[in-house]
Structure formats: C-alpha cells, structure tokens
Amino acid sequence: MALKVIKISRVSPATASVDPLIVPLSFFDLQWLKLNPTEQVFFYKLTESSSSRDVFYSSILPKLERSLSLILTHFRLFTGHLKWDSQDPKPHLVVLSGDTLSLTVAETDADFSRISGRGLRPELELRPLIPELPIYSDSGAVVSLQVTLFPKQGFCIGTTAHHVVLDGKTAEKFNKAWAHTCKHGTIPKILPTVLDRSVVNVPAGLEQKMLELLPYLTEDDKENGRTLKLPPVKEINAKDNVLRITIEISPENIEKLKERAKKESTRAELHLSTFVVTFAHVWTCMVKARSGDPNRPVRFMYAADFRNRLEPPVPVTYFGTCVLAMDFYKYKAKEFMGEDGFVNTVEILSDSVKRLASQGVESTWKVYEEGTKTMKWGTQLLVVNGSNQIGMYETDFGWGRPIHTETMSIYKNDEFSMSKRRDGIGGVEIGISLKKLEMDTFLSLFYKWIGN
C-alpha cells in the first residue's frame, strides 16, 4: 500500500506546565517493559464529500489536533519519555516543559473498504497505518499517533503505545476521552488522573525481583537487563504471506462452546464465561494449526486486572498499568491437539479464573517468574490481548463510530485480540494474524465447532 506522509506534527497540551513530572515505574508497569508496543488502528468511513481533501484539512484534522491538545492536559504522561539513567535503580516516566506528542498525517490511495474490512487481508498492507515509536537503550517515547486520509472514502487513526504507560482500561479511557472532547468540545468529567504509584500496594521485594527478571525477557542480551531496548520482533515480508482476519462470535456460538464444555467435562461447577470458552477454542485451534512435534513445549497467558484485588483497591481514576500475566507453561502440545484439547484448556482456565478471587499478587508473580525463566527455545506461545469487557467502538469523534478496529501488534507479539463486538448484542470479536498455511488450517478447525 502506497503511503504519502504529509506532515509530522508535535502536539503539546493546551495548558502548559513548567514543572517536570517524574513517575517511577510500578511493579505492574515493569512487567511490560520488554513487550513490544501495542498497536491499534480505528477506521472511520465518511461520505465522498465529507472526506475530500478540502474538508479533511480544513475541518476534520484541525478538530482532531485541537481536541488532542486539550485532552493531553489530562494525559500529560503521553507526551513524555521513558528514561533509565545509569544512577537510577529502575526506569521512570519523565515529562519536561515543552514535551510533545508526535502526530503523523498521511494519505493513501488504497481501497478503504477492503483495508478496513473483516475478511482475510495481507498483514503488510495495514502496517503503514501504524506510526513508529522510537525506543533506544536509555530513553524512549511512550505514545505516537497517526491519522491517515483515504481521500473520498474515510480516514483512520493509528496508535502505537508502550505498555508501561497504559493497559487496556487506560487506553480505552484515553480513546473515549479524546473522541468525546472532539465531538462535544468539552472534557469528560471522570478521567484517570491519579499518577501516584504508592497507591499500588504489592509485597515488598517484588519490584526488585521483576527487575532481576528483565534479562530473561531480552533474548539477545541476557547479561544486560539495564536497557530499554526491546527484543527483536518477528519480521514480516511478502513471501511469508501473513494474513489477518477479524471473526465475530455470536452469543449463540458462545453457547455452543459452553454446551460442548459441559458435555465433554466430567467436572461440575466450571467457570464457563465467554472469555474462558473463547480463549480455549482459539488456543486449541492454534496448537492444532501449528501441527509439528506433539512434544513441543507450549505456553499461554492472559492479563488479569488487579485494580480491585489489591488491599486497598487501586482508585478508579488511577493512570497506568495494573494487570499481571496469568501464566500456563507446564504443558506440551499433545495435551491440546487431541479431541479433549478444548475441554482440557477450559478446565485450566476455569480453575485460574476461580482462583483469582483468593490468589494474591505474589503467588501469581511466582508462576510467571518460573515460566519466564524456564521457557525453552521453540515454545509455542499465545497471549490474549484484551478481553470481552474491553470496548473499542465507543469512540465517536463526531463522524460516527469506527466501522472497524484492529490490534496490529498481535502477530509480532504472539497474540490474538479480543474485544466487545461493534453491534453491542453480545458475543465477542477476535483478531487473528497467521501465515497463510496456518491460517487456512486454523479457520477450518475454528468453524468446525461453531459454524460460519
């Protein structure tokens, strides 16, 4: 897809502050220090006349820039940098007077309907819609944005964000707040404004243990954990033929999966939530689609929200990351490749979700620590990005809700995405990105149990 960069703007908060802002990373922030940035894109379809170049540059873009400046007053951290100076024991988020957020403005002549669709599309065609986020060994930006015009068709907003500054809930609040401000010209009343990391109460010593784990998360630099440099990502080139697809799973199909779990399990009182059965179905289809050695190690994870699980609970207005990985690593592929693979996964996830009510941060951390330290080369990994509680379609900037959203970072981070459906009638929406051969097998297996 041909892309022309029109300009790169530096957007500053509407209300300037001369005081520096320095926020040390919390235990939860540190866990995501070595994860490659989260990338999302929101597609907005417009009429031919409202998406002309004249209208876009005279009306739409100025409104987006003006509202972004207003909302950055309350999301000032997004204009700052991640820093790790040699004298500091851990990294900090630092915002200085005059710091700004990078906003790239671009155009493309690509077919908007196809690019923003839900069907199979080449991964490479969508990559240009995501802005770069420069990260070096001792410093890095935390958020960058890109607005791309499809003349006479629509536009999209691409975001790239470092996970240390936000999780799914914080990202959702920012997107909604920016959209609300653009549409109505007013700032929402409730915003995540608490930056004080002391409200995150975790057992003493966990932060240091997390820092000691960092070298294990950077495969090319085991001896040096003191770097912000990210591990290498999976390269995507044309010959790999990596495809992505968005699948909407209806409430009826969710019920099919729940009934299947009840029928195949000998255990009573399973926690059969939409999240559990969807994750179990995707995971088992992924393992089978990979085929290969049945004795290969596998590892799957989801992020649990600990805001209400700490004592005392974290304020609802907390600005930052407050999720911890629930890790499942003591398994081989063969345990999920057979007909009982689905129910095996359901039981594992069900037990995990039920334990969350009583399981503390420290015991959850110990499992993740062991899984990370013992992870072997060639392990098949899958992480769910998001959940069926995260809604990405309530972001109306004044030109209607997005017709589609994509989490673009799922391929390189060994993830699949999960969120609420756009139509709001229940069920769930998932995003998958795989090489064509695996994708063909995955879809065949996926639809076998729930229908098209």
Swiss-Prot record:
Its EC number is 2.3.1.64. SUPFAM superfamilies: CoA-dependent acyltransferases. The keyword Transcription does not apply. One of its GO terms (molecular function) is agmatine N4-coumaroyltransferase activity. The active site is at H163 (proton acceptor), D396 (proton acceptor). Involved in the biosynthesis of hydroxycinnamic acid amides, which play a role in defense against pathogens. Agmatine is the preferred acyl acceptor, lower activity is observed towards putrescine. The preferred acyl donor is p-coumaroyl-CoA, lower activity is seen towards feruloyl-CoA. This is Agmatine coumaroyltransferase. It comes from Arabidopsis thaliana (Mouse-ear cress).
